[in-house]
Every structure is written in C-alpha cells, then in structure tokens.
Amino acid sequence: MTNEEPLPKKVRLSESDMKTLTREELCTRWKQHETYVQMLEAKYADLNSNDVTGLKESEEKLKQQQQESARRENILVMRLATKEQEMQECTTQIQYLKQVQQPSAAQLRSSMVDPAINLFFLKMKAELEQTKDKLEQAQNELSAWKFTPDSQTGKKLMAKCRMLIQENQELGRQLSQGRIAQLEAELALQKKYSEELKSSQDELNDFIIQLDEEVEGMQSTILVLQQQLRETRQQLSQMNQTQGTSSGAGPSRTSPSTASEPSTQSEPANASSSNVGKDCGRVSNGPSNGNSSQRGASGSSLYREASSADEDYPPSPSVSSPTHDGISKLSNHSEDAVSQRGGEGYVTQLSAGYESVDSPTGSETSVTQHSNDTDSNADSHEAAAVPKGSRTAGTRHSTQNGLDSSAAAVATNTSNASAGSVL
C-alpha cells in the first residue's frame, strides 16, 4: 500500500444490506474489509517491532521493583512484629508496675503504723512549709523591687547606678595608672642598679685580669731568680771544692801568713755578704717596687745574717799548729755557711720584696707562700712559666742583670777568700 492510495475504511454491513445487496457488491465490500484488515495488521506488526524491546525492559524494571517492594514489605512486617512484641512486653511491665505501685490495705496499714516512716513524713512536711514561706517572701521582695520604666524611683536608681559605674571605672584607671608609674619607677631603679652592677663587674674583671698578669709576671720572675740561685749555688759548690783541693795541696810555710789568715777571711766574707745584700736589695726592689727604707732594712738584715755566720764560725788563733789543714777546712766550712746564709737571706729578701706588692684583695700572703713553695718544685713550674715570660721581659732582664752582677761579686769575693786561705 502506497501513500498515494487512500486509506481503507471500515466496512459496516447491516442485515438489510445483506439482504438487498447483490453478490458483486458483497464481494467488493469484502475486499474493502480485507484491505482494512491488512492495513490494521501491518500497523500492529510495526508497533510490535518498535515497542517489544522497550516493553521487555519495562517489564524487567517492574519485576525488580516488585521484588524490592516485596523485600521491604517483608522487612516492615518483621519490624512490625518486633514492635508489637515490644509493645506487648511494655504493656505487661506497665501492668506489673501498676500492680506493684498499688499498695494493698495491709501495706498501707503497716506504713501508717511504722514510727520511722511517720517521722520521715513529718520532717518532709516541715521542710515543705519552710520552702513555701521562703518562696512567698522572695516573691514579695521581687514585687517590691519591680518598677515600670515610667516610674521616677526607677529612673533615679538607674542614674545612680550609671554614676557609680563611672566612678568605679575612673577609680580603676587611677589605680592602674599609679601602679604602672610605680612599676616604671621600680623598673628604672632596677635597670640603673643592673647597670651599676655590670660596671662594677667589668671593673672587677679588669682588676682580676691585671692581678693575673701581675701574678704571672711574679711567677716568671721567681722562676728566673730560682734558676739564678741554683746556678750561683752550683758555682759556690764548685768554688768550695776547688778551694778545698787547693788548701789541701798547699801547706802553710810561715806563721805570720797564717796569723793574718782570719782577718783576710773575715774581710772577704763581710765584703761578699755586703755585696750580696746590695745585689739582693737591688733585685728585690726591681719586681716589688719597694722604697728606700725597705732596701736599707733588707741590706742590714742580710748583713746581720752574714756577720752572724762569721761569728758562728770564727777562725782559730793558732798559727803554726800542725792542724793547719783542719783550720783551712773549718774556714772553708764557715765560708760555705756564709754563702748558704747569704742565699737564705737572698730568698727572704725576695719574699719580703714580693710582700711589698700592693694588692687590695689581700693576696700578699698567697704570693709569698707561692714564692716559698716554688723553691721546692721549680722544675715543674719551668714548663708552665716559659710561654708566660714574654709578658715580663723587661723585669726579667733587669733582675737578670742584677743577679749577674751579684753572682760576679760573690764569685770575686769567694776567689779572694780562697786566695787568702791559700796564702
């Protein structure tokens, strides 16, 4: 069937038409009816071909929805059953509680008869009456303090409250400002005090550094003096040995020479002691910066020690005795004692010179003790004082020159004494 052909129409035949129409007309009507039926069948086929897939999908969706709805229905039924069961349990519990709470006549009678319960109820009644009285009093006070915005008393009270609040704020500001000023003043004082403490601490540190430098210089000078003293002692011991050997080799020939021997021995001893005292005074005045009175006192004390040494060991007056070797040994011993005492006076003079150092911290005794202790352990201080000697090069040079001169004077005196003893 094409689009140009008209659409067939439904053929309708009544009973009268079936009787009146001829066979040919009936055939034509039948053919029209067949075309109409074919057209309907074609339309139905077209509709079936287009909508079968959609109908299947919709059918599957409907089946899934039906299954979900059935599952939900089952879940809801189960929940409903559980809720009904819980409701039944709650109703049973409520009934049980009602039965329990409804006391029987015997329970009521026993509770009324019990004196403890009666006392408890009486106390509860008294407390209830007290609370009611307090509540009424509080309500009366509240109603008395209530006022409307238009009332004059309320306005006055509000103005008074505002004024009091302002005064309180002003007083708080004044107090805070006064406290802040006081704290600022205290802070300034503390800062000033801390600055003063810092300055004093710096001064003390400088003073301590200066004292350390002075002590190091003194230690270096003490070390140098100890070395010089050791060298002089070695020289004296060597000279004494040479003198002893020379005195033993040359015997006395004439008595006048032996008679003049004590005077010649005493004079060089006195001269050597005086020279040593002068040199020691010069050395002690070098590092200790002593005055002239200290120098005189040190020289006189050293001279006294030398003279006392001469008096302790006087020479024998016998000139031509056969024990001339013993006399010469005794004179040598006296010279050794004089030299030893001169060395001791030298050490005491050095300690006295170091005691005259001005130290405000009261460390004079420690310095002298250190100078006395360093005589025994000079070897241990040599390695420590050698790098520090560069700080006191001038002082060391001056003291070394003085000690060199003193050592030369002692050597000349001892050589003169040995020559006199030989003569």
From Swiss-Prot:
Effect of a null allele: Multiple developmental defects at 24 hpf (hours post fertilization) including smaller head and eyes, smaller brain ventricle, and curved notochord.
UniProt KW Phosphoprotein keyword: no
Gene Ontology CC terms, in alphabetical order: cytoplasm; nuclear speck; nucleus; RNA N6-methyladenosine methyltransferase complex
Low complexity: bias regions: 405-423
Record's subcellular location: Nucleus speckle; Nucleus, Nucleoplasm
Segments of this protein annotated with the region Disordered: 234-423
Ranges of Polar residues composition bias in the record: 239-276, 285-301, 358-377, 392-404
Main location: nucleus
Alphabetical UniProt keywords: Cell cycle, Developmental protein, mRNA processing, mRNA splicing, Nucleus
UniProt xrefs under Pfam families: Wtap
UniProt keyword Cell cycle, yes or no: yes
Any Gene Ontology biological process: mRNA modification
Function text: Associated component of the WMM complex, a complex that mediates N6-methyladenosine (m6A) methylation of RNAs, a modification that plays a role in the efficiency of mRNA splicing and RNA processing.
Subunit comment: Component of the WMM complex, a N6-methyltransferase complex composed of a catalytic subcomplex, named MAC, and of an associated subcomplex, named MACOM. Component of the MACOM subcomplex.
Record-stated family: Belongs to the fl(2)d family.
Protein name in the entry: Pre-mRNA-splicing regulator WTAP
Natural source organism: Danio rerio (Zebrafish)
